[in-house]
Amino acid sequence: MLIQKQAAQGEQHISVSKEEYKMQYHVRTRILIIDDEPDITFGFKKALRDKGFEQVETANDSILALKNFKAGSYDLLIIDIVMPEMDGFSLYEEIRKIDKKVKVCFITAFQINYQALRAVFPAATSTDDIGCFIRKPVDMDDLVKRINAEIQ
């Protein structure tokens, strides 16, 4: 499948494959992975870079993540729900005060439904607009599909 892009000047058309287009988009997408387990953030970062995402950063605690977020500009955040300093939902609330448009995918090891999570974490009530919840262990191909759905 080819995607036609019209150049800004003149009638020149550039044809690129869907995969080439995705790769170009991946290169520009800035992702921040937030999880208190360094092996998780390292693994996600490596896997996402292998899939063509070149601008991937990590934070191993919520406070550092908030500091990084204030200092940078991100297209997507991958946030673990259970972290020691501040849970992922509370972090999400703080981030939404700064940027209401950033996309977020929550990751969790919980094997319970979203409604039950909302009962455990009061801050989860502000996440009605979030559709990206991924359970650990994470299938990286599924994660990439979910990221693509969120950023496009």
PLM region spans:
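Non-catalytic signal-transmission and effector/linker regions of two-component phosphorelay proteins
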Residues: M1-R30, R135, D139-Q152
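Active-site residues of response regulator receiver
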Residues: D35, D80, T108
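Two-component/phosphorelay signaling modules centered on CheY-like receiver
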Residues: P38-E57
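Helix N-cap/capping motif at the beta->alpha junctions
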Residues: T58-K67, G88
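Short amphipathic alpha-helix used as the core "switch/output" element in two-component signaling
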Residues: K67, F89-K100, V120-P122
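Active-site beta3 strand of CheY-like receiver
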Residues: G72-I78
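Receiver (REC) domain active-site loop signature in two-component systems and cognate sites
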Residues: M83
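Alpha4 helix (beta4-alpha4-beta5 surface) of REC/receiver domains from two-component response regulators
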Residues: S90, Q111-C132, D141, K145
